[in-house]
Amino acid sequence: MAGALVRKAADYVRSKDFRDYLMSTHFWGPVANWGLPIAAINDMKKSPEIISGRMTFALCCYSLTFMRFAYKVQPRNWLLFACHATNEVAQLIQGGRLIRHEMSKKASA
């Protein structure tokens, strides 16, 4: 069973459909977009003082909008959807870190 699944996957990777997918914007658009969530995840190690609330909010709205787009477009672009879902979660975490930081500053003042 596993051998048949591997064989089927290998046949698909060698197919013209897969090559066409690799050369389409349905593949390269999300690949380029992965820079946003990677940067947000990397910024989680940094001080919350550098977080911009406005930019975090804008990126949350952007990712929600394009998650909907990736779902509605035909054929559905699951790679783009996953990219923006990851970015949405990362930005919400960054927003939470910013709020926690601002609250602790007010509490200590």
From Swiss-Prot:
Catalytic reaction annotation: pyruvate(out) + H(+)(out) = pyruvate(in) + H(+)(in)
What cellular component terms from Gene Ontology apply here?
Answer: mitochondrial inner membrane
Span-the-membrane segments of this chain are 21-41, 53-71
Subunit architecture: Homodimer. Forms heterodimer with MPC2. The heterodimer is the more stable and dominant form.
Where does the protein end up? Mitochondrion inner membrane
Intrachain disulfide bonds: none
What GO biological process terms does the UniProt entry carry, in alphabetical order? mitochondrial pyruvate transmembrane transport
Q: How does it sit in the membrane?
A: Multi-pass membrane protein
UniProt entry keywords in alphabetical sequence? Acetylation, Membrane, Mitochondrion, Mitochondrion inner membrane, Transmembrane, Transmembrane helix, Transport
Membrane topology (Mitochondrial matrix): 2-20, 72-109
Q: Which family does it belong to?
A: Belongs to the mitochondrial pyruvate carrier (MPC) (TC 2.A.105) family.
Functional note: Mediates the uptake of pyruvate into mitochondria.
Q: What is this protein called?
A: Mitochondrial pyruvate carrier 1
- Report the residues modified as N6-acetyllysine: 72
Which InterPro entries does this entry report, sorted A to Z?
Answer: MPC (IPR005336)
GO MF term set? pyruvate transmembrane transporter activity
Q: Which residues does the entry place in the Mother cell cytoplasmic compartment?
A: 42-52
Q: Which residues carry this modification: N-acetylalanine?
A: 2
Q: Does the keyword Transmembrane apply?
A: yes
Q: Report the source organism.
A: Bos taurus
